[in-house]
Amino acid sequence: MTSRRDWQLQQLGITQWSLRRPGALQGEIAIAIPAHVRLVMVANDLPALTDPLVSDVLRALTVSPDQVLQLTPEKIAMLPQGSHCNSWRLGTDEPLSLEGAQVASPALTDLRANPTARAALWQQICTYEHDFFPRND
């Protein structure tokens, strides 16, 4: 069912357009990954970098909190094509369009309560050891 306004515009021969990316009019801007960032953390509910479990993971990766860029899945879509950085997805299943090693885990609350999920996260980190700990030979 079309609205009266739509009908009137159609009668006047005015073509209506719809935006493919409405966020572009709402101040959406492209995000760049700063050079000092070594890890992009992606979650719907971003955890505090001071959380004990998050701190343990960052320490194991030899990454300081200032080298972490926290983004929601919606913000990841705003990264330029070809962006490269290692990433940790918490509670998001969809792979990122971000080049680099990607480790995935359940959301932090689930990760905290599930030793099997924590072990799986550590296993992924070991799998991508050469990406997280590059050797400068």
From Swiss-Prot:
InterPro entries: DNA_pol_III_psi, DNA_pol_III_psi_sf, DNA_pol_III_psi_subgr. Its EC number is 2.7.7.7. This is DNA polymerase III subunit psi. It comes from Escherichia coli (strain K12). Part of the beta sliding clamp loading complex, which hydrolyzes ATP to load the beta clamp onto primed DNA to form the DNA replication pre-initiation complex. DNA polymerase III is a complex, multichain enzyme responsible for most of the replicative synthesis in bacteria. This DNA polymerase also exhibits 3' to 5' exonuclease activity. Disulfide bonds: none annotated. It catalyses: DNA(n) + a 2'-deoxyribonucleoside 5'-triphosphate = DNA(n+1) + diphosphate. The DNA polymerase III holoenzyme complex contains at least 10 different subunits organized into 3 functionally essential subassemblies: the Pol III core, the beta sliding clamp processivity factor and the clamp-loading complex. The Pol III core (subunits alpha, epsilon and theta) contains the polymerase and the 3'-5' exonuclease proofreading activities. The polymerase is tethered to the template via the dimeric beta sliding clamp processivity factor. One of its GO terms (molecular function) is DNA-directed DNA polymerase activity. Pfam families: DNA_III_psi. GO terms for biological process: DNA replication; DNA-templated DNA replication; response to radiation. GO terms for cellular component: DNA polymerase III complex; DNA polymerase III, clamp loader complex; replisome. Belongs to the DNA polymerase III psi/HolD chain family. Keywords: DNA replication, DNA-directed DNA polymerase, Nucleotidyltransferase, Transferase.
